[in-house]
Amino acid sequence: MEYIIGITLALVVCGAAAWLGMDRERVFYPAVAMAVASYYLAFAVADGSNEVMLSEAAIAAVFIVAAVAGFKQSPWFAVVALGGHGVMDLFHHHLVHNAGVPQVWPGFCMAFDVTAAVIVAGIILARARGERVQQRVRGR
């Protein structure tokens, strides 16, 4: 069930953002990636261990750096941050023993992250294609 909810939520969030034009600002998807990267830190608070908090902070930092690159350099880095975080969700329990993580979280988060990454990649490609078409039309 967590996979279905993760996929559905990503479709709703990304679809609504695109439909409403909220994602026209280049900061939108990098900000989503930064938020996604931060959740395990909240679970580390529930765990109560400083070691877990430091481990989660180090992992989050990797994805936050990628998200910042998605804002500063190329939106493809936001795709990498989201998709990479989804892959990390599969292995998180091997990286950190965070007792605060709900049992359904890794599956939910992985489903959301990977779905969002695919959607954002599709949006980037569609917009690039649209820009090329507009340039050809103007050039005629």
Regions found by a protein language model. Give the residues of each.
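Small-residue-rich segments of transmembrane alpha-helices in multi-pass membrane proteins
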Residues: 34-45, 63, 86-94
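Cytoplasmic-side transmembrane-helix entry/capping segments in multi-pass membrane proteins
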Residues: 26-35, 54-59, 78-84
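Membrane-helix boundary connector in multi-pass membrane proteins
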Residues: 72-79, 88-105
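Short, hydrophobic transmembrane alpha-helix segments
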Residues: 18-26, 45-49
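Membrane-water interface at the C-terminal end of transmembrane alpha helices
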Residues: 15-18, 68-76, 111-135
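N-terminal signal-anchor/start-transfer transmembrane helix
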Residues: 6-22
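Hydrophobic, membrane-inserted alpha-helices
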Residues: 11-15, 36-41, 58-66
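Structural signature of hydrophobic alpha-helical transmembrane segments
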Residues: 1-10, 50-58, 107
